[in-house]
C-alpha cells in the first residue's frame, strides 16, 4: 500500500482494508473523511461561503414520524460545523451540484468507516445549494450517520422465551441508506414520511432470483391522500403553483430530489430511465417577483411529497364540482331504529362543513322504501316538493331539474327537508328496501358530472334492482364453504360499481341492521369505486352511544376534503414493474388505477416485480395522483421514494419493514380467504412467515442446516411473528362458527383499507393498566405537549388483576375491564357508583367526575379516540370480569398472546413456526 502524503498537524491516516483506501481522522474532533486534508500552507482555491447551520436532527427517519406514530421525535445534539460545500480545490459553479452527481456504485450497507466518511461534511440546511462529490447525499449530519450505521448491522434475536416489546411497534422502519450523491439537494425531506408511502424492503434486490430466494415480499404500502392533523403539527404538502412541471420525455416521471443535472445545469437526467431532458426555461425564474429564482430552493427538488397545480393540458373537462347524492332508507326498520333522524340531523348540521368554498357544491336527496321518493329543491323555494316513483324495474327521473341542486342557492329548501325528513315517514310500516333502485336513480342524477353517492341502508335490499337474499346459513359458518359468504351474492352490484367508476361516481355505504345485511355484497360498491363501508350492527339511536358514534363518523365523512376524478400511476426505475394491486379502486389498465373520489387516509398496497436485472446503485419509485381538489383545482400529488440496491440476502433482511410486511400479509390473507378459504388464508400467513425465517436461518445465521432449538429473526422483524399470530386470530380471519358473516366481511373491509397507523392497532390492540398507571399518565407533558399514555402491556390475561382497571382498544372499540375485587373507591372515582355490583356492563358513556383519577382516565380514553387518523370514533364498553359470556369473550379475544378456542397461544404459535423453519 502506498504511504499517505504529509498531513496537517492533528490529522491521522488509518488504512481501511474493506475500502482498500486510507481514511483521514481529525484527532481533535474525531471527524473522518476520505479526501486528503489539505495543509493550510498549500495553495488552494478560494473557500466558498459556509452554508447556513441546520438543526442536527437526523434527516430520515424524519420528525414527521412523530406525527404519524404519536411519539416525540428524538433530540440530537447541535450540528458540527462544516468547512464548505465541497472538497477544497473543487471548482465552484454558478449552478452548483451537477459536477459531483455522477452515480457511484456502492453497497448500501458498507463498512462502518467507509460510510462514515461519506456522511461527514453534510450538515447543510434544507433548501441550501447542493454539495459536490460525496457530500451531495440526501441525509446529512454526523449524528444521523452514526445512528444509521449502527442500525445496518444484522442483529439476530432468538424469539423462543422472549416477551415481545410491544412498544417497538411505534418504531420507524429501517432507514434507506442511499449513496452519498443520490439526492440533488441536502433537504431532510427528500424521502417521504412512511405514513404516505413505505416499502416492505428498504433495499432493492438487484434480481428477481435474489428476491425469490429471500422469500421476502416486495410491495409498496401507501396512503397518498393522508390527512393533515393540526394536533400532530403535520406540515402541509408543498404546492408548486407556477405551472412549471418538468417531466421525463420517455418514462413521464416527474422531476424530483434524485435527478441529476448535467451540461452546466441546462439538462437533467431522469433517475428512472436515464434519459437526458431539457430544464424548462422558467424553472429558474420567479414568476411572481419577475426575477431569477434559486433552483435549489424549488419544492420539487427538496420534498419527496409535493403537489403541482396542473395546467389545462391535464384536464379533459372543467374541474368537477363536489356532488353529494344521499340515498336514505326510510323503511320501517330505518325509522324505528332512529337512523333516519340522526342521519338527517347530521347532514343538516354539516351543510356548512361540506367542501363548498367556491359555492359550486351540488346536493340531491332520495328516500327509498318500496318506492323511490325524489325531492324537488328549487332555488327560490323554502319548502321541498316530494315526487314518488313506484316503478322500480325501469328507474327514471320524474323531473329534469331541481332534483340535483346547488347547495348555496337551494339552502332553504334543503334545510327544510332535512328538518322534517324523519317525521315525513314516521308512520310508515313499509317492510322492504329498494336500495338498488335508489342507487341507480342517484347514478342517473349525477352520472354526467360525477361525485359521491352516500347510501344509508337499514335492511337487506329485497325489491327492485339488486335484490339480495339472506344467505347467512349457520351451517356454513366454520366450514370451508364459509368463504362463499365473503364474496358477492349478486353480480349486479359489481357491474353497477364499474359503471359508476366509468362516470366518476363513488359510493359510500353506511349500513345499520340488527339482522343480516350482506356486507360482502354491498361492499362491492365502495371497493370498485374508491369509497368506504361503515357498519353499525344493532344500531339504536335511543342509546346515546350509538347515536354519537354514527353522527361523529358521518359528520367527519361529510366534512372530509376529497380528491375527485382521480387516477393513480406508479412508476419505477428500469427493471421494476407493478404486478398486483390491493385496495378500493378500479384497475383501468395494467398500471392505471381509477378513483372517482380519493378519500383521506385510505390505504393501498401494490406488489412489485423485478423484470430485468438492476444495474444502478439505487432505484426510485414514484407515485402520481392526478386529481381535482374539492375546491376546483386540478393537481398532481407526487410521492417519490428512493432506496439502495443490494445483492445480499442479509442486507435485504436488515432492511425489511415489519409494519409494511404485516400490512401486505393482511391484504393477501383477505384476498386468499375470498378465493380459497379462511383456513387457507391463515395458513398462508403462517407459511409465508415460516419461509422467511427459514431463509434467514439458512442464509444469514450460522445455524444453517439441521434443527435448532432457537427461532432466529433479525431485530428489525422482532414483532412480525407477533403480528402474524394476531392476524390469524383477527375477527376477519380467525377460526370459529360464531362470527356473523357481516362482522367478518366488514373486518375484511377494514383490513384492506386502513392506513398502517390505524391498521396495526386493529390487528394488535393496545392494552393499558389504569388503576396503577404512572402519575404522569393521563396528563399533558413531554416535549411535544401531548397527552401521556400509560405503558403498553403485552396482550395476555396474565396481566389482568382481580382488583384492577384495564383498557383494551383496537381503534374500533374500547373495553374498560373492571376486576371483580376492584375497591369501592376506584368504582366511585371512575363511575360515580358505590360498588362494583351497581356497575352495569355494555356500551357506556364515561362520566368526567371532579377528582384527579377520573380526569386522567377520561383523558386516556379521549386520547385513544383521537390519536389516529381517520373518521372512526371507537365505542366504549365496560366489561366486568364476571360479565355475560359474549361480551367477556369479545374483550378477551383481543388478548392475542393467549390461547383462544382452538387457536394456539403466541408461544405455541412460535413453536409451530419453529417446526416449519426446522423442516419438521
From Swiss-Prot:
Residues holding Zn(2+): 248, 251, 270, 273
Organism: Cryptococcus neoformans var. neoformans serotype D (strain JEC21 / ATCC MYA-565)
Alphabetized PROSITE patterns for the sequence: WW_DOMAIN_2
SUPFAM superfamilies: beta-sandwich domain of Sec23/24, C-terminal, gelsolin-like domain of Sec23/24, Helical domain of Sec23/24, vWA-like, WW domain, Zn-finger domain of Sec23/24
Entry protein name: Protein transport protein SEC24
Record has Membrane as a keyword: yes
Annotated region described as Zinc finger-like, given as residue ranges: 248-273
One BP term from GO: COPII-coated vesicle cargo loading
Main location: cytoplasm
Gene Ontology molecular-function annotations: SNARE binding; zinc ion binding
Amino acid at each position: 500500500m502506498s504511504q499517505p502524503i504529509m498531513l496537517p498537524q492533528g490529522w491521522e491516516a488509518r488504512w481501511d482494508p474493506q475500502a482498500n483506501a486510507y481514511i483521514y481522522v481529525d484527532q481533535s474532533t474525531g471527524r473522518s473523511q476520505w479526501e486528503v486534508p489539505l495543509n493550510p500552507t498549500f495553495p488552494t482555491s478560494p473557500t466558498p461561503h459556509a452554508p447556513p447551520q441546520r438543526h442536527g436532527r437526523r434527516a430520515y427517519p424524519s420528525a414527521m414520524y412523530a406525527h404519524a406514530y404519536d411519539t416525540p421525535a428524538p433530540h440530537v445534539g447541535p450540528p458540527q460545523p462544516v468547512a464548505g460545500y465541497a472538497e477544497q480545490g473543487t471548482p465552484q459553479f454558478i449552478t452548483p451540484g451537477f459536477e459531483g452527481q455522477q452515480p457511484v456504485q456502492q453497497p448500501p450497507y458498507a463498512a462502518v468507516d467507509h460510510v462514515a466518511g461519506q456522511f461527514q461534511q453534510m450538515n447543510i440546511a434544507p433548501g441550501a445549494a447542493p454539495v459536490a462529490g460525496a457530500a451531495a447525499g440526501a441525509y446529512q449530519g454526523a449524528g444521523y450517520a452514526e445512528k444509521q450505521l449502527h442500525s445496518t448491522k444484522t442483529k439476530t434475536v432468538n424469539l423462543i422465551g422472549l416477551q415481545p416489546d410491544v412498544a417497538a411497534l411505534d418504531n420507524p422502519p429501517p432507514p434507506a441508506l442511499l449513496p452519498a450523491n443520490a439526492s440533488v439537494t441536502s433537504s431532510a425531506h427528500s424521502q417521504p414520511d412512511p405514513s404516505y408511502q413505505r416499502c416492505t424492503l428498504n433495499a432493492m434486490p438487484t434480481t428477481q432470483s435474489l428476491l425469490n430466494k429471500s422469500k421476502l415480499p416486495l410491495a409498496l404500502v401507501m396512503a397518498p391522500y393522508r390527512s393533515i392533523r393540526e394536533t400532530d403539527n403535520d406540515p402541509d404538502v408543498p404546492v408548486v403553483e407556477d405551472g412549471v412541471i418538468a417531466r421525463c420525455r420517455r418514462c413521464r416521471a416527474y422531476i424530483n430530489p434524485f435527478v441529476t443535472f448535467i451540461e452546466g445545469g441546462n439538462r437533467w437526467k431522469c433517475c428512472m430511465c436515464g434519459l437526458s431532458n431539457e430544464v424548462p426555461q422558467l424553472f429558474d425564474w420567479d414568476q411572481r417577483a419577475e426575477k431569477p429564482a434559486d433552483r435549489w430552493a424549488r419544492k420539487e427538488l427538496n420534498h419527496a411529497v409535493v403537489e403541482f397545480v396542473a395546467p389545462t393540458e391535464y384536464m379533459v373537462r372543467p374541474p368537477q364540482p363536489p356532488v353529494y347524492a344521499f340515498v336514505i332508507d326510510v323503511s320501517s326498520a330505518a325509522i324505528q331504529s332512529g337512523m333516519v333522524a340522526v342521519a338527517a340531523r347530521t347532514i343538516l348540521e354539516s351543510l356548512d362543513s361540506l367542501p363548498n368554498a367556491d359555492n359550486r357544491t351540488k346536493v340531491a336527496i332520495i328516500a327509498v322504501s318500496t318506492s323511490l321518493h325524489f325531492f324537488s329543491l328549487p332555488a327560490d323555494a323554502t319548502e321541498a316538493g316530494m315526487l314518488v316513483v313506484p316503478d322500480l324495474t325501469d328507474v327514471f327521473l320524474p323531473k329534469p331539474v331541481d332534483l340535483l341542486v346547488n347547495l348555496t342557492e337551494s339552502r332553504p329548501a334543503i334545510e327544510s327537508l332535512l328538518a322534517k325528513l324523519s317525521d315525513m315517514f314516521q308512520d310508515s310500516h313499509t317492510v322492504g328496501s329498494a336500495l338498488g333502485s335508489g342507487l341507480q336513480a342517484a347514478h342517473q342524477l349525477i352520472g354526467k358530472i360525477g361525485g359521491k353517492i352516500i347510501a344509508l341502508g337499514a335492511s337487506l335490499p329485497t325489491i327492485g334492482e339488486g335484490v339480495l337474499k339472506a344467505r347467512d346459513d349457520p351451517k356454513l359458518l366454520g366450514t370451508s364453504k364459509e368463504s362463499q359468504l365473503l364474496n358477492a351474492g349478486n353480480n349486479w352490484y359489481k357491474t353497477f360499481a364499474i359503471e359508476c367508476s366509468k362516470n366518476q361516481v363513488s359510493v359510500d355505504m353506511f349500513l345499520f341492521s340488527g339482522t343480516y345485511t350482506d356486507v360482502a355484497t354491498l361492499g362491492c360498491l365502495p371497493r370498485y369505486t374508491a369509497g368506504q363501508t361503515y357498519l353499525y350492527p344493532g344500531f339504536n339511536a335511543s342509546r346515546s352511544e350509538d347515536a354519537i358514534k354514527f353522527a361523529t363518523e358521518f359528520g367527519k365523512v361529510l366534512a372530509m376534503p376529497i380528491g375527485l376524478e382521480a387516477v393513480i400511476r406508479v412508476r419505477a426505475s428500469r427493471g421494476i414493474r407493478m404486478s398486483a394491486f390491493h385496495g378500493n379502486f378500479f384497475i383501468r389498465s395494467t398500471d392505471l388505477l381509477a378513483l372517482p373520489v380519493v378519500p383521506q387516509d385510505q390505504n393501498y398496497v401494490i406488489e412489485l416485480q423485478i423484470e430485468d436485472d438492476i444495474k444502478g446503485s439505487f432505484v426510485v419509485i414514484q407515485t402520481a395522483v392526478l386529481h381535482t381538489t374539492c375546491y376546483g383545482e386540478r393537481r398532481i400529488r407526487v410521492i417519490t421514494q428512493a432506496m439502495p440496491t443490494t445483492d445480499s440476502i442479509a442486507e435485504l433482511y436488515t432492511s425489511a419493514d415489519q409494519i409494511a410486511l404485516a400490512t401486505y400479509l393482511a391484504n393477501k390473507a383477505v384476498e386468499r380467504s375470498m378465493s380459497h378459504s379462511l383456513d387457507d388464508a391463515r395458513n398462508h400467513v403462517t407459511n409465508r412467515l415460516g419461509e422467511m425465517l427459514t431463509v434467514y436461518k439458512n442464509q444469514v445465521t450460522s445455524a444453517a442446516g439441521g434443527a435448532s432449538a432457537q427461532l432466529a429473526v433479525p431485530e428489525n422483524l422482532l414483532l412480525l411473528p407477533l403480528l402474524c399470530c394476531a392476524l390469524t386470530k383477527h375477527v376477519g380471519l380467525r377460526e370459529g362458527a360464531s362470527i356473523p358473516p357481516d362482522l367478518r366481511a366488514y373486518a375484511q373491509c377494514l383490513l384492506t383499507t386502513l392506513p398502517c397507523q390505524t391498521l396495526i392497532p386493529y390487528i394488535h390492540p393496545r392494552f393499558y393498566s389504569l388503576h396503577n398507571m404512572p402519575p404522569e399518565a393521563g396528563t399533558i407533558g413531554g416535549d411535544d405537549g401531548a397527552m401521556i399514555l400509560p405503558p403498553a402491556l403485552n396482550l395476555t390475561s396474565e396481566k389482568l388483576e382481580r382488583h384492577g382497571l384495564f383498557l383494551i382498544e383496537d381503534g374500533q372499540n374500547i373495553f374498560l375491564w373492571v376486576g371483580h375485587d376492584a375497591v369501592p373507591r376506584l368504582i366511585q372515582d371512575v363511575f360515580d357508583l358505590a360498588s362494583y355490583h351497581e356497575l352495569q356492563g355494555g356500551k357506556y358513556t364515561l362520566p368526567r367526575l371532579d377528582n384527579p383519577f377520573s380526569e386522567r382516565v377520561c383523558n386516556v380514553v379521549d386520547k385513544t379516540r383521537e390519536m389516529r387518523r381517520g373518521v372512526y370514533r371507537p365505542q366504549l364498553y365496560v366489561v366486568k370480569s364476571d360479565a355475560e359470556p359474549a361480551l367477556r369473550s369479545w374483550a378477551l379475544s383481543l388478548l392475542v398472546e393467549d390461547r383462544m378456542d382452538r387457536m394456539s397461544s403466541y408461544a405455541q404459535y412460535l413453536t409451530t413456526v419453529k417446526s416449519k423453519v426446522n423442516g419438521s
